[in-house]
Amino acid sequence: MQRDYTATEVFQESGPDAIVYLHGGAWIDVRNSPRDFAELAARVREDAPLASQYAVTYRLSPEVQHPVHVADCVEHISQLIVEKGIRKLHLLGHSVGATLCWQILTALPGDRRYPEGPDFAMKLALVRSSLAHVFLVDGIYSLRALLEEYPDYDYFVNKAFKSLKDFEDPSESAERISAGPILHVIHSYKDELLTLKQTQYLTAVLTAHQIPYKLYVDDLGLHEDVYRNEKVAAYIVAQLP
């Protein structure tokens, strides 16, 4: 059953600097939602009371497929920027939320693998123009590498994508990363669903393209614990002005 994909979770409204969270759930899991970040947002609020905090959602597969997920995220984030007067945006995505963050950074309007039309291009440009930090937390970045390591994960990949050809690998898209936002790649040693291979794949691509990034690897709990972890909250706060 699909939930209300237009729902935005408001954790804190404090000013024009804002963190926006994107949840995971393998593009298919209704158990993951913007509320995933309630505990993390509360931890961040303790030490960063001037940062507004929101979380958005997106329609799930198999009812819809890529690129609808990224189109929904861009739509909702751009709406927040306009309605809340956000001037400095910090994105944090967990699991496929990190995938979506990467796609927001690198999507090429007009490419068949991404949403079509001038409306998407305009809203994507607005989101990118506001970006300051992007936190990629225990993310999926290469479907090809993912399925080589976890063949059984095709059960959700095949629901979210008509074909692997519809997914642009970071090795193809990294060259379009702008010099603006600071990238943070975060991974938990204890993640039982994703080893470090996805993170290592992405950082190798970033290094090959000489794109600066910050890497934070630590014991941050299991896959569904990372986005509640106090160390992650402390890391985020340390990056904010």
UniProtKB/Swiss-Prot annotation:
EC numbers, comma separated: 3.5.1.9
In the UniProt entry, which residues are flagged as the active site? Answer: 95 (nucleophile), 191, 223
Catalytic class of the enzyme: hydrolase
One annotated GO molecular function: arylformamidase activity
Q: Does the keyword Metal-binding apply?
A: no
Q: Which Pfam families match?
A: Abhydrolase_3 (PF07859)
Q: Which SUPFAM superfamilies match?
A: alpha/beta-Hydrolases
Q: Which HAMAP family match?
A: KFase
Enumerate the PANTHER family for this protein.
AB HYDROLASE SUPERFAMILY PROTEIN C4A8.06C, KYNURENINE FORMAMIDASE
Q: What information about domains appears in the record's comments?
A: The main chain amide nitrogen atoms of the second glycine and its adjacent residue in the HGGXW motif define the oxyanion hole, and stabilize the oxyanion that forms during the nucleophilic attack by the catalytic serine during substrate cleavage.
- Please describe the quaternary structure of this protein: Homodimer.
- Could you identify this protein by its name? Kynurenine formamidase
Q: Species name for this entry?
A: Eremothecium gossypii (strain ATCC 10895 / CBS 109.51 / FGSC 9923 / NRRL Y-1056) (Yeast)
- Show the taxonomic lineage: Eukaryota, Fungi, Dikarya, Ascomycota, Saccharomycotina
